[in-house]
A protein has these predicted regions:
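Conserved, single-site charged/polar hotspot
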Residues: 1-250
């Protein structure tokens, strides 16, 4: 939980994150091809999924003991809480910031799950760095596109990108790139973009890519959970909003 949300965020948001992470871990266990060889990955070096005690101490400094005690108490209070769908733990995925709507799972991972559908998360528009622009030189973009097996014409960089087709939630489903169709998630990964909700502009020899939100967009918006908690919603209410049709079991 400490790796996923700032300790300064509301109790109910932190509890919602803890329940989602627990449920997602159980879902991964139940759907692993080879459970004995591992079914969930974390990357402490990149601060993903898990933080070492040393890193937590460096983050929290003199507030370490107080913060750890608070977070431990919050996690302990929901330790046995799990989101279920159809009598099995739900794949309660989570991410940082949406574009204002969450994304349906089939548009990102190819598999539709009835509780991973588009829901409103318009409070995310107030998130820090909701809009974020990165710049690529034409040479950098050419190298990336070539790495995707595309053939960009060096003499006509303005023609490399066509008009994007969007999902219902407004993320890029696909777009023409150098005469071929590339999915939004694939281009996001190749370019290291914060989100698959992006626009592309070419001007004066450079490409400007502006994203809305941060993360894959499926499931619990962490910023949205913070906003709903600040509005007085409980962890259970937050999870019911982002994972419709699920049941919280204790």
């Amino acid at each position: 939980v400490a790796a996923e949300m700032p300790i300064s965020w509301p109790d109910e948001a932190l509890k919602a994150q803890a329940i989602a992470a627990h449920s997602y871990a159980l879902y991964c266990r139940d759907h692993a091809a080879e459970p004995a060889s591992g079914w969930l990955s974390v990357d402490p070096v990149r601060r993903q999924g898990y933080l070492t005690d040393a890193v937590l101490r460096s983050y929290w400094g003199t507030a370490y003991e107080e913060n750890y005690a608070r977070l431990s108490a919050l996690v302990d209070s929901v330790l046995t809480d799990v989101l279920y769908y159809d009598s099995a733990p739900a794949g309660a995925s989570y991410f940082a910031i949406s574009n204002g709507m969450t994304e349906a799972s089939e548009n990102v991972w190819g598999t539709a799950l009835p509780y991973l559908v588009a829901v409103d998360s318009s409070t995310d528009l107030n998130a820090d760095n909701y809009l974020y622009t990165v710049q690529f030189t034409a040479e950098q973009m050419q190298q990336t596109l070539t790495g995707l097996g595309l053939l960009p014409d060096p003499a006509a960089p303005a023609s490399w990108f066509g008009e994007a087709a969007l999902t219902t939630s407004g993320y890029v489903a696909s777009l023409p790139v150098c005469g071929q169709s590339v999915t939004g998630p694939a281009l996001r990964k190749a370019l290291g973009l914060r989100s698959a909700c992006f626009t592309v502009q070419y001007q004066e020899g450079s490409f400007l890519l502006t994203t809305k939100g941060y993360g894959h967009g499926v499931g619990l918006s962490q910023w949205g959970a913070k906003a709903l908690a600040e509005q007085g919603q409980s962890a259970e209410e937050i999870l019911a909003h982002y994972f419709p049709g699920t049941e919280l079991r204790r």
